[in-house]
């Protein structure tokens, strides 16, 4: 079960990830996306960790990268807490401590989908990127 859904109360996948964090030593884990710019937070060894969650709908070998908008990356790096980017693929997931693992590339990306507004300009946005081949992929258990 891949842990991601934007619903306020969470879904089975969110509960799985919270359970996984608690099983691995985190305490007081809760959803925070209603009132913070990150999705989950919890304590480990007395320190607060914030989790930004991303969902990729294909296997990790198909995507080959982990992306985060440059604006969000800059914001999260300035937080006084530990910050982890959790990216979920259909086959595995990856956790990146964004304060201690610099992105491998900063690039611009244009969304491939046209919005419902036909006159909407497709504006490129800056993203930071880590390559999957250089990361440790974790199995769902």
Kindly give the residue locations of the regions a language model identified.
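A structural signal for short, well-ordered beta-strand segments and their strand-loop junctions
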Residues: 30-31, 50, 84-87
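Surface-exposed cleft-lining segments at the edges of enzyme active sites
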Residues: 3-4, 57-62
